[in-house]
Amino acid sequence: MRKVAFVTGGSSGIGRCTAIALRQAGCVVYEFSRRDNPIEGVYHIGVDVTDEAAVHAVVSRITQDCGVSILVNCAGNGISGAVEFTELHDAKAQFEVNFFGMVNMSKAVLPYMRKQGAGRIINISSVAAVAHIPFQTYYSASKAAIESYTCCLANEVKPFGISVTCVQPGDIRTCFTEARRKSIVGDDVYEGRISRSVEGMEKDERNGMSPDEAGKYIAKIALKPHVKPIYTLGFGYKCLSLLCKLLPCRLRNWIVGLLYAR
């Protein structure tokens, strides 16, 4: 029987490429996003993942018809700017999409996965979860929250045959860069450090890995028989993630500051 996969944020970027890779691997794929950007052979579900009631309604309808084997939580966005000048509603909106959107989808599929005694949930984090990027504070914090959530949930649902894992991409060439909500309010007070930091990040992203490669990697993990709690995408970022874990916090933060807070 073909596996049924749900992919959020499937209209563009990593989510779209993951949906395509899972379809090519033989899965029945449903992509969940607000915007319809048709993919041949993939079913589009128009929903906002931050709308808990809508998410539960549509997941209930689909799972009753065909079940669910895999959930990939790719939906996300980014904001940048100095914490001092970031409006609280913008910070909360960042968490609503990146973190609570993932929570809504996970909670919706868990009862069905538990009853069938199997399932795989993949949450997309970021290397920014371990290399905490200044002037991307709320983005980094939301991704760190995803990793904590993933590890906790993995232990909670393991007895039911459900595995939960997290993928840390580094810089990826997608429309995420252009879609980021940038604010340079206070750049004069911070002596140009906000704009320099964001420009540096965006340069790295434009020179990053292709989303096709990222999507194939995520699809491969989705179909593995067993998974680790966290995967890092790309050799260089695997080394960076390992260094962040091994280096003393003070030294690690000093190095990140040299790169992104000067």
Show which residues each predicted segment covers.
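Active-site helix of classical SDR
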Residues: S106, S142-A145
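Substrate-binding pocket helix/loop in short-chain dehydrogenase/reductase
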Residues: A82-V83, D90-K92
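SDR active-site lid
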Residues: P159-K228
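Residue(s) in the substrate-gating loop at a strand-loop-helix junction
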Residues: S126
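Conserved glycine-rich Rossmann-like NAD(P)H-binding loop of the short-chain dehydrogenase/reductase
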Residues: Q24-E40
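Rossmann-fold cofactor-recognition segment
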Residues: G41-A53
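N-terminal Rossmann NAD(P)H-binding glycine-rich loop of SDR-like oxidoreductase domains
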Residues: S11, A19
